[in-house]
């Protein structure tokens, strides 16, 4: 195995671990999930560019008769990238003590203010950061509102 194959293997493994954590791990951490809301997908064009670059590398590897393991690693890396960006839905998980947003756990006591913009974006002001939350369905904003009213 060459250095390139090792690096591809590491990145593929890291992306696979991230996908598993995002799908199953966050549900198990910090207690029971009380509310799950799907968010809008972002950065789709970035993934398309990434998969396009991987396709170029794959084509070059096949035409120059490169190592077969490199071909398999490039294909698996592209498939995981497609899964993460196009198949999986980003989500916001509400727990008893806080919520998961962008794979980070934020406790409720860190929230300083909450506002709703005209175009349906929930703005949560934290101590040093502002979260802009775009949900897929506007009804989910009402669910979030009722969750905060009932649980806080």
UniProtKB/Swiss-Prot annotation:
Keyword list, A-Z: Cell inner membrane, Cell membrane, Membrane, Transmembrane, Transmembrane helix
Recorded topology in the membrane: Multi-pass membrane protein
Gene Ontology CC, one term: plasma membrane
Coiled coil ranges: none
One Pfam family per UniProt: DUF986
Transmembrane segments: 6-26, 45-65, 67-87
Domain of life: Bacteria
Predominant place of localization: membrane
Cellular compartments annotated: Cell inner membrane
Family under the similarity heading: Belongs to the UPF0266 family.
Name this polypeptide is given: UPF0266 membrane protein Spro_2816
Species in which this protein is naturally found: Serratia proteamaculans (strain 568)
